């Protein structure tokens, strides 16, 4: 059996955790449409710090550190404009939000950083949500999931891949890199059961 190293209380349900490659601190992100992220020390040597999303945004449950540990990237919802953004946080500045990149889609979920730190890969699930409606999915008839590749330094769009038109209700959610650096992704079907691919 394992030994409990530390325990971190969260304001509400969390979704995913990412760890700094330099100092080992973790950040757990709220499940969407949550507005918190909690920075914690897995060894329990420092008190947790709660971050609150900026006005007009909420977290989508995922994030990643830059390889040098200086930046934290987080998937966020610009909910009044139904668009995904990547929030950028300055770690040394107390995780102060210093900007955002357009993620070129709706309903971002997981985001990964390539091993060399040059590219952000974003799974835009294609589902519009708004905190005024809880977790209600507002556009199932017009979903547009896509996979986006962004320059991690500038936010510039490197590429965007879409599923074939008949698969528009497959919401791209989670991803992984294989040993060759290829991206594999999993989807959730959000259509009627009788039309499931």
Predicted features and spans:
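Beta-strand-rich domains and repeat architectures in extracellular enzymes and scaffolds
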Residues: 1-29
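A short beta-strand motif characteristic of beta-propeller blades
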Residues: 3-9, 46-53, 96-101, 156-165
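Repeated scaffold domains used in trafficking and secretory/extracellular systems
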Residues: 12-19, 57-64, 106-112, 168-174
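Residue-level detector of Asp-centered blade-edge/turn motifs that repeat once per structural unit
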Residues: 21-23, 66-68, 115-116, 178-180
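Hydrophobic beta-strand positions that form the internal "hydrophobic ladder"
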Residues: 26-27, 72, 120, 183
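Structural recognition of the beta-propeller blade-terminating site
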Residues: 30, 38-41, 76, 87-90, ...
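Short, conserved, GDST-rich strand-edge loop motifs in beta-rich repeat architectures
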Residues: 75-79, 122-143, 185-196
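Beta-propeller blade signature
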Residues: 85-93, 137-153, 196-197
């Amino acid at each position: 059996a394992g030994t409990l190293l530390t325990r971190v209380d969260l304001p509400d349900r969390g979704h995913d955790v990412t760890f700094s490659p330099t100092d080992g601190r973790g950040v757990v992100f709220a499940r969407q449409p949550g507005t918190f992220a909690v920075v914690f020390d897995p060894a329990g040597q420092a008190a947790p710090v709660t971050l609150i999303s900026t006005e007009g945004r909420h977290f989508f449950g995922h994030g990643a550190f830059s390889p040098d540990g200086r930046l934290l990237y987080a998937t966020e919802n610009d909910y009044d404009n139904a668009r995904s953004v990547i929030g950028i946080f300055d770690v040394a500045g107390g995780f102060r939000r210093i900007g955002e990149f357009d993620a070129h889609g709706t309903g971002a979920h997981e985001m990964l950083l390539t091993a060399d730190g040059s590219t952000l890969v974003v799974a835009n699930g294609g589902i519009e949500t708004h905190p005024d409606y809880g977790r209600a999915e507002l556009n199932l008839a017009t979903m547009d999931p896509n996979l986006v590749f962004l320059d991690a330094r500038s936010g510039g769009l490197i590429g965007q891949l879409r599923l074939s038109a008949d698969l528009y209700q497959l919401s791209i959610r989670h991803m992984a890199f294989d040993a060759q650096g290829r991206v594999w992704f999993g989807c959730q079907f959000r259509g009627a059961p009788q039309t499931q691919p």
